[in-house]
């Protein structure tokens, strides 16, 4: 039977302002849950449960499930449907303190079909809690996942690649076509697995994320130009030759570790405030 594409699912009209596209493909749902492999002792958190496509099979694996949902209509619906077994945090995931859900001795795991219109800022927000999280599994626009896992030298390698790869090991788990959703998005989707690097096993030196954000924002500000042009303003405060950093390269050719080295050499007064804009590369 053909799936509905009207945007109305289980009596709920998908809201464009919340970026709602409801997952309706049972095969994809089961594949995602299998990839997550929830364990009874996990502290499992779902962002944007929507109408419960992932929520139901996840709740079959854990005693309680915590969810973060912005849509008030869906919050009420979820509470009526699942009762005390579901702990609902009503509010914006972009402002939620995920660190408060960490329980010593238990694995904090975060999953979700993320709204594509806020995916990059939400990923950056979540990175602040990486030291308390075991792993994350997210459905995202495939183009975003491609950027997240891209290697230096590829066209997809970007600011987002650098800022997330320094915090996580990441891999593409599953590709998902538009027809798996109601309403179908205009783009292909994919599931990504994100595992925070343990402090003692990270391939990268510790780095101030604001300093790294400052460097990569400058570096990728004009992708077609070599770094001698985009990072030229830093030559007065950083000895690039001493770092062995070749300014004749383009930003997309530079390994993450090289960006980290530059960020660690950046004087505090040159660090830009706030989080970098990761939406455009």
From Swiss-Prot:
Q: What's the Enzyme Commission number for this chain?
A: 2.1.1.182
Coarse class of the primary localization is: cytoplasm
Q: Does the keyword Nucleus apply?
A: no
Q: Which reaction does it catalyse?
A: adenosine(1518)/adenosine(1519) in 16S rRNA + 4 S-adenosyl-L-methionine = N(6)-dimethyladenosine(1518)/N(6)-dimethyladenosine(1519) in 16S rRNA + 4 S-adenosyl-L-homocysteine + 4 H(+)
Signal peptide bounds: none
* Gene Ontology MF terms in the entry: 16S rRNA (adenine(1518)-N(6)/adenine(1519)-N(6))-dimethyltransferase activity; RNA binding
Q: Which InterPro entries match?
A: KsgA/Erm (IPR001737), rRNA_Ade_diMease-like_C (IPR023165), rRNA_Ade_Mease_Trfase_CS (IPR020596), rRNA_Ade_methylase_Trfase_N (IPR020598), rRNA_adenine_dimethylase (IPR011530), SAM-dependent_MTases_sf (IPR029063)
What SMART domains does this protein map onto? rADc
Q: Which SUPFAM superfamilies does the record associate with it?
A: S-adenosyl-L-methionine-dependent methyltransferases
Q: Which GO terms describe its cellular component?
A: cytosol
Task: Describe the function of this protein.
Answer: Specifically dimethylates two adjacent adenosines (A1518 and A1519) in the loop of a conserved hairpin near the 3'-end of 16S rRNA in the 30S particle. May play a critical role in biogenesis of 30S subunits.
Note the NCBIfam families from the entry: ksgA
For this entry, the protein name equals: Ribosomal RNA small subunit methyltransferase A
Source organism (scientific name): Ralstonia nicotianae (strain ATCC BAA-1114 / GMI1000) (Ralstonia solanacearum)
Q: Tell me the classification of the organism that encodes this protein.
A: Bacteria, Pseudomonadati, Pseudomonadota, Betaproteobacteria, Burkholderiales
